[in-house]
Amino acid sequence: MMRPHTLVATALFLSFVAGARAADTVPITQEHPMTSHTATGPFDVKRAPQTLSGVAEHSGLGRMSLDKQFHGALEATSAGEMLAFSSATPGSAGYVAMERVHGTLDGRAGTFVLQHSSTMTRGEPLQSITVVPDSGTDALAGLAGRMVVDIAPGGAHSYRFEYTLP
């Protein structure tokens, strides 16, 4: 059974994610000598509240599993986990997440891991979603890049993935 603070953190996180805008991202700080590519498309996401560890039980954090299906230039599924926190100040929250993506990117098959670290300060969101270095496998070995998630007012999710491959 979920505790009330977990339900509150989960509900506030969902409102945080719904306020995400594509322009609110952290730029890539590394320069990649390879040619850059951009993949775009919609995706579906299922989130499910999970029980926190005993250590974090009274921390005010919320924990959720992520199950995504990407469409478009990235045809893939992903599975991951997220921790979220919402402060007492309305519109201020943050989350971190890790997800392993498995599928094809512009026809190249493999897996890679995305790392999320995003915040919202009094309603102003800032996203950072990057490929974990050296996490690409098979035809995606050497993948580097960042993803931007956009959530339309009706809740439809889409992505823009700027990446490089050797």
What is each model feature region?
Residues A9-V17:
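Bacterial N-terminal signal peptides
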Residues A23-P166:
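Beta-strand-enriched cores of mature, soluble protein domains
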